[in-house]
Each structure stands twice: as structure tokens, then as C-alpha cells.
Design a protein with these regions (language model features):
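Conserved subregion of the PPM/PP2C metallophosphatase catalytic domain
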Residues: 1-148
């Protein structure tokens, strides 16, 4: 953050969600720097990870970022995405929104690829190929104890 602030005459900023997984304790540590709340899927139920975002990177060089933790049991999935997903619009200028995002995660095949594909397919069906003006990025990670 300090480096970005010191070499940023244009005043640009970036959101970020940093995560460290601990496979020994079925949990993860994370910092949310102004990014969208991730969706977690546990036992077939999808919901937003309750986290208070800190300020975006590149805004204040003395910003403090709080490290939080969350449970991440065997079979759980976390889905990270850019705002181009929930802010995607259809031909009627309606947003895809958070409710559709959570529903897509919950109804998807419960693999990391399945969640990414499920969100993307729901998004494509909703927008009906209407032109989008922001990036659309979806990343999902599944805790699979049966794999190394």
C-alpha cells in the first residue's frame, strides 16, 4: 500500500482481497481492502462472508488493514469476484446483483470449477450478451481434504 501511494501521481486505487489458507485448522486468514464480500458455500448453503472492508489500496499511505479469520471446512468453497459480476447489466439496465450471485453459487455444481461456471452461465443468461463495461473475473477455491 505504501509503495502504491508513493508512486501514484494519478491518485489511482485498487481493491484487493488477500487470503491465506490453513489446511491444518480448516480456516483462513484474510484482509479485505475495499473489495466485494466473497460468497462462501458450506453444506450446500451460499452466503456472503461477513467481513468489514478496510480502505482500498493506494488511498492513504498510513491505512491499517485488519486481519480476520473464518472457518473453511472440508468441502467448503469461497468465491471471489470483481464488481463486473454483480454490476453486470442486461438490456433493460437491470443489475445482475448480489441475490442472483448467491443463488448461482448455491445452485452450481459444488466444485470450484462448478461454482465459477455456474456464476458465469447465470450471468450470461441474465445479460443475454448485452455489452459490459467492466472486467468480469470469478475465482473459486474448494477445501478438499482428499487431495494434496
Amino acid at each position: 500500500n505504501r509503495e502504491l501511494c508513493s508512486s501514484n501521481p494519478e491518485g489511482m486505487f485498487v481493491t484487493a482481497f488477500a487470503v491465506i489458507f490453513d489446511k491444518n485448522s480448516d480456516s483462513f486468514l484474510y484482509i479485505n481492502a475495499g473489495h466485494n464480500k466473497p460468497v462462501t458455500v458450506s453444506n450446500g448453503k451460499a452466503e456472503f462472508l461477513e467481513c468489514k472492508p478496510c480502505i482500498m489500496l493506494g488511498v492513504f499511505d498510513d491505512a491499517r488493514y485488519v486481519v480476520n479469520s473464518a472457518e473453511f471446512g472440508n468441502g467448503d468453497i469461497i468465491c471471489l469476484y470483481t464488481d463486473g459480476v454483480n454490476e453486470a447489466t442486461n438490456a433493460d439496465n437491470e443489475f445482475f446483483g448480489n441475490e442472483r450471485l448467491v443463488s448461482a453459487c448455491q445452485n452450481a455444481e459444488q466444485t470450484a470449477k462448478g461454482v465459477c461456471d455456474g456464476v458465469y452461465d447465470a450471468l450470461t443468461d441474465f445479460t443475454e450478451n448485452a455489452e459490459q463495461f467492466d472486467d468480469i473475473t470469478i475465482v473459486a477455491i474448494k477445501n478438499s481434504k482428499n487431495r494434496d
